[in-house]
């Protein structure tokens, strides 16, 4: 019999952490190896089953001791903040385990540190773990390649009022897909935060607009607009469990893989 994949969850008391704990508990072939919370969290010492609303306690308490948990795990699923993710990446690299990164908001220097960690660990990193969004990215890439420069590209995203970064990681993922389709670097054509008298739209730009409010899980729309017509591609996330399920799929996929930096497109086999 194949042993269960032992998974550590970061941000165990958060919305994604609790969802992951519930799904791991329900899924055959997976076992919960522990849950991490930051120093000073009021949830430290709380049973993970209690945090996730399970009928029975798990016997595992939320802890800040990442080293102890990670060294005995098979995978780390990480929806946290960039500073914490960089620390976890170093530990995952030392332990040679699968590190699934759903954290967003990284700076360029952070991305370089993650690439360095991927020389020793299997890292699956994505701005969005859902099948639907990754299929959308493939469609956006194809559309951007097929349509000429007369078509303007704008990306609009909306999330709940508590989200702290903008544009969302998913919006950037879609922007990267559009830029790849056009054969350009996103950082060279990205247009964000338009306000006041900005002048006419620059040809070739990929624009971003971010909305925040309510409890929206995630809405993303990519608009291709030219004279007299418009193409709209989009995705609506109705339940954050889609991201958790994708992360668990990535953790399974990464078992037995060598070191490297992978995406959900790799996991899902999407070109």
Curated annotation (Swiss-Prot):
InterPro entries: DapB_C, DapB_N, DapB_N_CS, DHDPR_bac, NAD(P)-bd_dom_sf. The keyword Transmembrane helix does not apply. GO terms for cellular component: cytosol. The active site is at residues 159, 163. SUPFAM superfamilies: Glyceraldehyde-3-phosphate dehydrogenase-like, C-terminal domain, NAD(P)-binding Rossmann-fold domains. Pfam families: DapB_C, DapB_N. It catalyses: (S)-2,3,4,5-tetrahydrodipicolinate + NAD(+) + H2O = (2S,4S)-4-hydroxy-2,3,4,5-tetrahydrodipicolinate + NADH + H(+); (S)-2,3,4,5-tetrahydrodipicolinate + NADP(+) + H2O = (2S,4S)-4-hydroxy-2,3,4,5-tetrahydrodipicolinate + NADPH + H(+). Pathway: Amino-acid biosynthesis; L-lysine biosynthesis via DAP pathway; (S)-tetrahydrodipicolinate from L-aspartate: step 4/4. (S)-2,3,4,5-tetrahydrodipicolinate binds at residues 160, 169-170. Its main location: cytoplasm. PROSITE patterns: DAPB. One of its GO terms (molecular function) is NADP binding. It is found in: Cytoplasm. It comes from the Bacteria. Catalyzes the conversion of 4-hydroxy-tetrahydrodipicolinate (HTPA) to tetrahydrodipicolinate. Belongs to the DapB family. This is 4-hydroxy-tetrahydrodipicolinate reductase. The gene is dapB.
């Amino acid at each position: 019999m194949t042993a269960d994949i032992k998974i550590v969850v970061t941000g165990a008391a958060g919305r994604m952490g609790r969802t992951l704990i519930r799904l791991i508990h329900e899924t055959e072939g997976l076992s919960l190896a522990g849950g991490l919370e930051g120093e000073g969290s009021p949830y430290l010492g709380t049973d993970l089953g209690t945090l996730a609303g399970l009928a029975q306690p798990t016997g595992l308490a939320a802890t800040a001791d990442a080293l102890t948990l990670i060294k005995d795990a098979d995978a780390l699923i990480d929806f946290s903040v960039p500073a914490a993710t960089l620390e976890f990446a170093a530990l995952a690299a030392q332990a040679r385990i699968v590190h699934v990164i759903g954290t967003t908001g990284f700076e360029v220097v952070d991305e370089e540190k993650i690439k360095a960690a991927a020389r020793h660990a299997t890292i699956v990193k994505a701005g969005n773990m859902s099948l639907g969004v990754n299929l959308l990215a493939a469609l956006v890439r194809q559309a951007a390649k097929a349509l000429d420069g007369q078509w303007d590209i704008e990306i609009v995203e909306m999330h709940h009022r508590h989200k702290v970064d903008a544009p969302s990681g998913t919006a950037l993922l879609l922007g990267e897909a559009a830029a790849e389709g056009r054969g350009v670097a996103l950082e060279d054509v990205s247009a964000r935060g338009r306000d006041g008298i900005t002048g006419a739209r620059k040809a070739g730009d990929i624009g971003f607009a971010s909305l925040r409010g309510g409890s929206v899980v995630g809405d993303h729309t990519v608009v291709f607009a030219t004279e007299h017509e418009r193409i709209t591609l989009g995705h609506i996330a109705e339940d954050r469990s889609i991201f958790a399920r994708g992360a668990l799929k990535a953790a399974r996929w990464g078992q037995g893989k060598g070191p490297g930096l992978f995406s959900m497109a790799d996991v899902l086999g999407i070109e």
